[in-house]
């Protein structure tokens, strides 16, 4: 859904999902921030007052777990990564107006203010719940301290989310067959008292919010299934030492910290507030964005007239956190009397060489690796912004990177700009003394209109391609008119052609700035323009360039074969080393237990402990597993990881919903032999009945099959 009103009279804020401060950045992380940065630049280009903010997520179990493994305090551990992120983002020309973190004073105070507001408006209650407990360590196991089985889809899940399957948020006590990540032992459930936000108070509001929401379709459609039934209350506290303390002046919160997904999104508000405190509210007023007519309007309803008195809140996130931003977060804001998001853009994932990005297997391209390779950051920005629509996955490969840079940037944009400016400088000392032709002016005006439309559609890919298409037009124009032949035969026409080409070059600089800001700035300087291209509006694309400028330099450099070959070899070696290390670690564990070890070249997994409870032969006889064959496979609308399969099991063709979308090419699945658990209870996922379960092994969803061609419907014994 688009916003036809941009630019508006109210300020806008573009935010990006907070990176967990517990690991190095890779290209998968960077996609969200490149898209957010490009959108914020484009909004400014059309005259929309815009702030671009984010921050590091310092709290939660991932940070606490990794800090404990390193033997340092969680804050020290997280601050180290926060400082690294703050240094890395600008190296990719990702320029936040403010980049804070969730443990800073501003965010802690705002978070506690939000909670007090919820309590005062009776949106919080206390109840006893079952929480996972490690009996060996004698401590509770919040969130990622526990893993097990998702009660909704049966996939492997973390304590607070089904990250491998249906992507649902999981409340404490929901996960089945819980296992402690501290000791690897089965966990037990014990009763504890915790605080809950009454999401049911906001059910009607949330349904209307999704109707109003702009952005990507997945952000609007995916949450509908979650709010159709009775909304479960959100547990907002955890049994941990690390996090924002539950407010001391509110009864019953002793020794509890707030759930990380309470304080994390509030950092968007805190970071915007910090920006205002730095530049002054005359330049940018955070309350004009986050509050309604700069005030708090409490209640569980929304008045459509408030939209005219409120700023534009735009969230750019990974699609794995849609539920948090499209269900929990708007309820949190409404409960505190704040404004609601205007739009949510949920980006697709980034794969590597046709495979899922896997940090455990070192199948990743790291941010510092890209920079160390010596490539300009804008080349990556262009690749990732134009690789697919924002809500679709992008595959990154060094070979494709080379192909696109050399073909699209060097061969198209760079070629047109260099020969146009070089010809102009050598023959006219700069811009020829002529007016721009009507045809070229019209073409630039069309490009400007397309740019404005792309911003209103939140179409980052189109934003990037407009400048490329204009450059392609310029290449065709100069090639068709051959000014090098006109200089002697028709000097006036030669002047006209080069005048047009210089104007097209300036327009390309203006239009490519959101995605290629560094290269646009360099081109701006080559044109002899004053100031920064970042500060001009779209109209400047039609303003005359300076009469004089110096000899240009090549804007883009060719990516050489030997460089790419070396990077491919390095990546392959890392993947192989990680696989070998994983195999050795598993083998060592097996030998210590006295098990025989297979010395073959086989990938091994981090093994979960065996289930201690035994089943009888009669119980096993009750499990009906059949040989099947996938007849068709198609994505489930609104679900990022699910496919709807039709599986032939001899007796009949079954419809099955399976979490295979990110791990298998749907087009290649038909004809694949699988094992189907045929007497699995029927389930409904995203409104589709699933009649059985396809069996698969491990995080990569390795599909189980038979060694020989057993007839369809053959029972597994």
Swiss-Prot record:
Localization, UniProt: Cytoplasm
Q: Where does ATP bind?
A: 359
So which domain of life are we looking at? Archaea
Which major enzyme category is it? Answer: ligase
What's in the keyword line of the UniProt record? Aminoacyl-tRNA synthetase, ATP-binding, Cytoplasm, Ligase, Metal-binding, Nucleotide-binding, Protein biosynthesis, RNA-binding, tRNA-binding, Zinc
| Keyword Ligase tagged | yes
The reaction(s) this protein catalyses: tRNA(Met) + L-methionine + ATP = L-methionyl-tRNA(Met) + AMP + diphosphate
Annotated tRNA-binding domain ranges read 619-717
Task: Supply the CDD domains for this chain.
Answer: Anticodon_Ia_Met, MetRS_core, tRNA_bind_EcMetRS_like
Spell out the Low complexity composition-biased ranges: 580-590
Listed binding positions for Zn(2+) are: 150, 153, 162, 166
Renumbered ranges of motif 'KMSKS' region: 356-360
Membership in a protein family: Belongs to the class-I aminoacyl-tRNA synthetase family. MetG type 1 subfamily.
Q: Which HAMAP family match?
A: Met_tRNA_synth_type1
For this protein, the record's NCBIfam families field holds: metG, PRK00133.1
User: What does the record give as the function of this protein?
Assistant: Is required not only for elongation of protein synthesis but also for the initiation of all mRNA translation through initiator tRNA(fMet) aminoacylation.
> What name does the UniProt record give this protein?
Methionine--tRNA ligase
Q: Which organism is it from?
A: Haloarcula marismortui (strain ATCC 43049 / DSM 3752 / JCM 8966 / VKM B-1809)
């Amino acid at each position: 859904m688009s916003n036809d009103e941009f630019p508006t009279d109210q300020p806008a804020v573009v935010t990006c999902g907070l990176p967990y401060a517990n690991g190095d950045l890779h290209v998968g992380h960077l996609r969200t921030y490149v898209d957010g940065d490009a959108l914020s630049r484009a909004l400014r280009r059309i005259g929309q007052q815009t702030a671009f903010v984010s921050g590091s997520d310092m709290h939660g179990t991932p940070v606490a777990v990794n800090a404990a493994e390193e033997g340092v305090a969680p804050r020290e551990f997280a601050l180290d990564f926060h400082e690294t992120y703050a240094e890395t983002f600008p190296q990719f020309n990702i320029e936040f107006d403010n980049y804070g973190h969730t443990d800073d004073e501003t965010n802690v105070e705002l978070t506690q203010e939000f909670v007090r507001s919820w309590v005062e408006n009776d949106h919080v209650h206390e109840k006893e719940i079952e929480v996972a407990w490690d009996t060996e360590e004698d401590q509770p196991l919040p969130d990622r301290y526990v893993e097990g089985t998702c009660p909704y889809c049966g996939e492997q899940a973390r304590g607070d989310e089904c990250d491998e399957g249906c992507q649902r948020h999981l409340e404490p006590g929901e996960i089945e067959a819980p296992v402690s990540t501290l000791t690897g032992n089965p966990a037990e459930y014990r009763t504890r008292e915790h605080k809950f936000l009454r999401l049911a108070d906001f059910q009607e509001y949330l349904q209307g919010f999704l109707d109003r929401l702009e952005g990507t379709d997945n952000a609007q459609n995916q949450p509908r299934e979650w709010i159709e039934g009775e909304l479960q209350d959100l547990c907002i506290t955890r049994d941990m030492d690390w996090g924002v303390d539950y407010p001391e002046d509110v009864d019953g919160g002793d020794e509890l910290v707030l759930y990380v997904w309470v304080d994390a999104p509030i950092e968007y508000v805190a970071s915007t507030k910090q920006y205002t405190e730095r530049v002054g509210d005359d330049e940018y007023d955070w309350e004009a964005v986050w509050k309604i007519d700069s005030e708090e309007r409490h209640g569980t309803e929304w008045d459509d007239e408030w939209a005219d008195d409120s700023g534009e809140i735009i969230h750019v996130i990974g699609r794995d956190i849609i539920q948090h931003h499209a269900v929990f977060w708007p309820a949190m804001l409404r409960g505190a009397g704040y404004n609601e998001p205007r739009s949510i853009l949920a980006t697709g994932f980034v794969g590597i060489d046709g495979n899922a990005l896997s940090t455990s297997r070192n199948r990743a391209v790291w941010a510092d690796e890209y920079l160390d390779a010596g490539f300009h950051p804008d080349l990556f920005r262009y690749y990732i912004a134009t690789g697919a629509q924002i809500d679709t996955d992008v595959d990154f490969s060094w070979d494709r990177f080379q192909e696109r840079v050399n073909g699209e940037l060097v061969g198209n944009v760079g070629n047109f700009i260099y020969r146009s400016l070089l010809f102009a400088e050598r023959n006219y000392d700069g811009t020829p003394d002529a007016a721009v032709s009507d045809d070229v002016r019209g073409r630039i005006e069309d490009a400007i209109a397309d740019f404005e439309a792309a911003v209103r559609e939140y179409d980052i890919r189109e934003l990037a391609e407009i400048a490329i298409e204009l450059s392609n037009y310029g290449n065709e124009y100069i090639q068709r008119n051959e000014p090098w032949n006109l200089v002697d035969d028709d000097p006036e026409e030669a002047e006209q052609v080069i005048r047009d080409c210089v104007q097209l070059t300036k327009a390309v600089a203006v239009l490519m700035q959101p995605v290629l800001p560094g290269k646009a700035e360099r081109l701006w300087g080559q044109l002899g323009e004053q100031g920064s291209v970042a500060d001009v509006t779209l109209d400047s694309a039609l303003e005359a360039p300076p009469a004089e400028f110096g000899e240009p330099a090549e804007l883009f450099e060719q990516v050489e074969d030997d460089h790419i070959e070396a990077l491919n070899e390095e990546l392959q070696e890392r993947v192989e080393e990680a696989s070998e290390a994983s195999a050795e670690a598993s083998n060592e564990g097996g030998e210590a237990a006295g098990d025989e070890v297979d010395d073959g070249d086989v990938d091994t997994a981090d093994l979960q402990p065996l289930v201690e409870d035994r089943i009888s032969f009669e119980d096993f006889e009750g499990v009906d597993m059949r040989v099947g064959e996938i007849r068709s496979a198609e994505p489930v609308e609104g679900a990022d990881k699910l496919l709807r399969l039709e599986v032939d099991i001899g007796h009949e063709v079954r419809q099955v919903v399976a979490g295979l979308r990110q791990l298998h090419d749907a087009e290649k699945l038909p004809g694949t032999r699988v094992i189907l658990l045929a007497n699995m209870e029927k389930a409904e996922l995203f409104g589709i009945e699933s009649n059985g379960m396809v069996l698969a092994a491990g995080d990569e969803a390795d599909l189980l099959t038979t060694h020989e061609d057993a007839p369809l419907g053959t029972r597994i014994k």
